[in-house]
């Protein structure tokens, strides 16, 4: 919103910047990995990649016509990234994975990120793990032995309260308090545990909308079990 641009990314590994007044991209960056998820607030633009890698851009450098990641590093989660969502203040991001985990990563100074060169590129060193960074499990059925683990399909931050929601392949939506590292609310209003595929808040932060449908987490055969339907509108206080 600050820059009046459109960002796109795809499995070809290309991230494009479009000025809506022109037909083609004005800037482009080619990753070696597929792009799975992207999120941008203010100057912070974060890209979730295949092979569990994360790319961080500083969009303030666009004024100097520089469009390349400040950092490419290995995610602190062990399995495929499903969703990236930048904090409303642009000072960090949440990352969800197919393993039913969410990681919270704070960016203390976007203009002074640690640069540690390795054979595989640039990575964040251990000393960059701040005290406010953490990860937690979610979207799991612990009544089973072993527990059933579901993907985190989407993450959305409330623009007013700073809390955030997750939705998953288990058909559950949860609301979390990042500062106190606790779950505030959890509910499943969807019949037959149809996966929830995406979610978002309105600008006032009092409505949470989510979409539902099969997310292919159980392969093609399981798609026959799910039927499309309408979700009720939900009010979040």
Regions flagged by a language model, labelled:
Residues 1-237:
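WD40-repeat beta-propeller superdomains and closely related acidic/aromatic-rich repeat-like regions
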